[in-house]
Amino acid sequence: MYKRSLIAASLSVAALVSAQAMAEINGGGATLPQQLYQEPGVLTAGFAAYIGAGSGNGKAAFLNNDYTKFVAGTTNKNVHWAGSDSKLSKTNETNPYLSAHGSAWGPLIQVPSVATSVALPFNKSGSNAVNFADVNTLCGVFSGRLTDWSQIPGSGRSGAITVAYRSESSGTTELFTRFLNASCSSALEGGTFAITTSFGNSFSGGLPAGAVSAQGSQAVMNTLNAAEGRITYMSPDFAAPTLAGLDDATKVAQVRGVSPAPANVSAAIGAVTPPTTAQRSDPNNWVPVFAATASATDPSVRPYPTTGYPILGFTNLIFSQCYADATQTQQVRDFFTRHYGASVNNDTAITNHRFVPLPASWKLAVRQSFLTSTNNLYIGHSNVCNGIGRPL
């Protein structure tokens, strides 16, 4: 009798542990913020460890509930959220998702998480600061027009330049190619840069000769450090191990005399206003993107700032408004409460990882929209999520 009771109790505990494991909130995607999201305490209770897989894989995992985009061969887990530096395309991603899954899973939420620079670390010995005082020089390096370090004025270096880049669908690549698209002269470069998550497909003239690639932020940094003469574009969290490292222009290039340190993008980010109340029901309006000029039809498109470090953008969060499990619904609210809190929040961790916390006006807009029970955008709103939601 005792043995049967012990077995029954063991089975009950095993079932409970299994249910708890299944109930974890699974997410992953962009590697730019990977180390931030893996910092203890940034993700709140109930969240599984963040999996860095690239923005493209993160979006695909969420949009199709396909966990294999995070871990190949694992088909018994659901995807509950994603991180992406690449904004969801309203036409190609958000609208098809709502058509295919909206009735069963509910609307999606897309909001900026932190602001970021895109740094330009390089591996070329020398004591001079490397400064792309003229953006055309930067464009020439990444188009392949300029092939030797001696062609970068003031660098005090010579030898072949080798561009290292992300091989997979990367949101960091999208942030970088947005800048190149807006800033580079087609007449000078002999081609144009397309805004894309695939650097290999960006420049119409093809990749620079000898360019090398790797998958993920850390792998690209390893590739960069494997041989002299290499340069890449990178998350500030991976480009340098410390905040002071971002200001070391013998290892991380300046652009127009400015380093990619957070202080050099915070003023520009502070000038970006959140969507108006009337605009907030459209996920597209929540994520600002930069371009040569503002758009008359898309309020999320803002002109690049004229001061400070110019290569910047946001890394974003993608969640559902509705989850089938009430516990998960509350856990998602708890994370939003923490991450977008007015006083108790993740700002210290964000700053320590060389990112820029969202301004108070943005955090307030998120709380008003997704954490206020009388707002139709409220996470788990009974009128929207009645009997539907992403699966446990």
Curated annotation (Swiss-Prot):
Transmembrane residue ranges: none
Subunit structure: Homodimer.
Entry protein name: Alkaline phosphatase L
Induction record: Strongly induced by phosphate limitation (150-fold for MDR25 smooth colonies, 1400-fold for MDR25 rough colonies and 5000-fold for MDR1). Highly expressed compared to the same gene in PA14, suppressed by inorganic phosphate, but less sensitive to phosphate than strain PA14.
Species annotation: Pseudomonas aeruginosa
Signal sequence coordinates: 1-23
Substrates-to-products reaction catalysed: a phosphate monoester + H2O = an alcohol + phosphate
KW Secreted (keyword) present: yes
Record carries keyword Iron: no
Pfam families in the cross-refs: PBP_like_2
Family: Belongs to the PstS family.
Location of the protein in the cell: Secreted; Periplasm
One MF annotation (Gene Ontology) recorded for this entry: alkaline phosphatase activity
InterPro entries linked to this entry: PBP_domain (IPR024370), Phosphate-bind_PstS (IPR050962)
Function field: Has both a phosphomonoesterase and phosphodiesterase activity.
Protein EC: 3.1.3.1
